[in-house]
């Protein structure tokens, strides 16, 4: 790290922005090895039959790689003949993946420097660990969505041309060789047919070979797509992270806004700016899906739809289908977000009032943000994981049948607790109870299959200790508190609980 800081200080003093020479430094690949998104799947872990050494990480590979990079016209020759035993011929693009992992660390340097410089003038860096939680967005929904009228369900457009990704980074990185190297990676990954592909029609599936690089590229692309909302970030970015704020600082962005949007609205720039400053507009995104909600009219949402489609067309040079943006009223619309089926239903009620000797009924309407577990997609996810069949009937899991009894119970119990933890904010718990029932009975069937016994006999032998493994810590605490207080159990279990320690979506929920 000290060598890296020294190089960056030297480059800054000379007003240079060359990142390409860092590819010849061994510590870059060490950083990629230590801080990769998927360390166990890192390309630096070479099998013993390839390196000849019985160890996971081989520094010999890095030295061999740097030596080959130094060879004249090495990258060019490797592109012309990918079948040679060279850059892309060794172990199925082995060295190419090594360089791409190192390049993923290097390409993040300009953004890291920008983030550090933005924090230098601040005496105290605000602690926003709780805002990293996925659940932190739902209290925001509870406070805001119940007062809004319209919502636009948006799918971020894809696929994007690879050259556009290079042009996006060109605004940040002035090192031409690094951009050419990125084009080279695109050429190879495009041949592998696994660069960035649409998955389930709502978000991108990243390359398994280098998730860090392509996650970085995707985030850069998404920020560019959202650049139309730069005027709204002060009004609607309660949960904005610091890195996103530095991403949005673009010197030439206002020229793009003035060039494209003014033509679309056929009016002057000030009125366009007034529309963007709608104080009741809220924008939330997760993965490739975003939600734009407003208290305005349906006509206002149509204007925003036109802005999005035309801005993406002018800026990215491809046609974004208008059917990807659905405008609905909150009263009759439900949307999937972070594994929940969310809606804002209208609940009519009548209140009996009395004025002097006259009685009359007053009809009132209330709106409340509801979150429920989508049981049908969830059963489909459990079916893919072999916990039940497509009808939701629990089945045994033969893959775990060879484990010990304690390991089997622990795995099923951990899965059940994780899902209970994630879906603790559900408004209605019936679907969650059904998921718990499926996992408990699937565990019992797996144990009965292992011991060649029946499920009933096995449950009688284990008793209540078997069920305790499936209780969360909160449920165990409630079982101790409830006997001491007079509080309805059914009302307590209807309360929603949002946790501020969930930083990623549950694996089973991610299959929805």
From Swiss-Prot:
PANTHER family: MATURASE K (PTHR34811:SF1). It is found in: Plastid, Chloroplast. The gene is matK. HAMAP family: MatK (MF_01390). It holds the Pfam family MatK_N. The lineage of its organism: Eukaryota, Viridiplantae, Streptophyta, Embryophyta, Tracheophyta. InterPro entries: Domain_X, Maturase_MatK, Maturase_MatK_N. Its main location: plastid. This is Maturase K. GO terms for biological process: mRNA processing; RNA splicing; tRNA processing.
